């Protein structure tokens, strides 16, 4: 028996959605995750994955069932969760992918570190933070795209203007 007690990484995040199709298009088509095998829970949903040191499934999605609450409809936005942070590579390619999909995003450079960040919302209004280590990128960051500076606490999700993916 192991007496060590430690958190070793992110296992998964669960997102509730009213639009499974658009949510899957975002997480698979924009973020590049892949669908993973999911047990039959008797309700719509998905497990999405990428290779991580601690496992495969990192995002679970509910689209119906008791987890959606008493009305069966979930509110949009992150509620008490501010964002989900994922390590990533390919900062410039992700910015281009966001532009091509007509997604609004924000950028941030963490002071006194080698980390850069991109913030973007999924179709359910969950803010996703992609964190990049400069040592894994193909060159320096350069200036932040005008009008895309990240400000903590700023909500830039607009469901009415969210593009069809």
Per-region residue spans from a language model:
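Residue-level structural signal for beta-strand termini and adjacent loop
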Residues: 41, 64, 131-133
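Hydrophobic side chains in well-ordered alpha-helices
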Residues: 23-26, 94-98
């Amino acid at each position: 028996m192991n007496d060590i007690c430690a958190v070793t990484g992110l296992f998964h995040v669960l997102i509730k959605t009213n639009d499974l199709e658009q949510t899957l298009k975002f997480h698979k088509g924009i973020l590049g995750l892949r669908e993973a095998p999911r047990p039959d829970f008797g309700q719509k949903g998905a497990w999405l994955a990428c290779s991580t040191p601690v496992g495969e499934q990192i995002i679970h999605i509910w689209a119906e069932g008791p987890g959606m609450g008493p009305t069966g409809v979930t509110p949009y936005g992150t509620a008490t969760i501010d964002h989900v942070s994922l390590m990533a590579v390919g900062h410039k390619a992700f910015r281009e992918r966001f532009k091509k999909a007509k997604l609004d995003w924000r950028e941030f450079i963490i002071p006194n570190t080698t980390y850069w960040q991109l913030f973007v919302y999924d179709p359910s209004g969950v803010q996703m933070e992609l964190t990049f280590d400069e040592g894994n990128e193909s060159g320096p960051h350069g200036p932040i795209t005008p009008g895309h500076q990240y400000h903590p606490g700023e909500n830039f999700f607009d469901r009415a203007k969210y593009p069809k993916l």
